[in-house]
Amino acid sequence: MKKHALILSLILGLSIIPAGISYSTDADAGKAITEIGILVNAQKYQIAMTKCNAAIQKYPNESFLYYWRGSIHNSMGEKQAAIEDFNKSIELDPANEKAYVLRGICKADLEDKEGALEDYNKAIELAPEDGSAYSMRAMVKLDLGDMDGANSDLDTSNKLMNSK
């Protein structure tokens, strides 16, 4: 599960940067978010963490700064710290489906399968066309013994990912 979670974390991170989306109305904050995302995708976690902490001091209401810091914590195996940052990201932007998916990954890694399932359900509610949440939810359903639900989610995920 952890190997798949790392791969999905990288995919989710990469999906933000190429589109040039910063998710910020402040140009300087947007630039910081983009730079941090690039560092995370390059697996330069310590440098990214330093920049992220500095940016949070300057822009404490930027949801995606907490998202990226949570991603860094997750990549470094610091699941509880990651969950706290994803909680803050969601508090600031309840429509950020990527934060729900990554928080769900952390919860699943900490054996909170029901909490993970709730997060994946919310991510799917927010972005039903995103196959990654279906894939992760399938893994949790499999762990919970719901083979039919897991197969259904994998089918949906494959259809969505193949249609892009």
Predicted segments, located by residue:
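Alpha-helical tetratricopeptide repeat
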Residues: 2-164
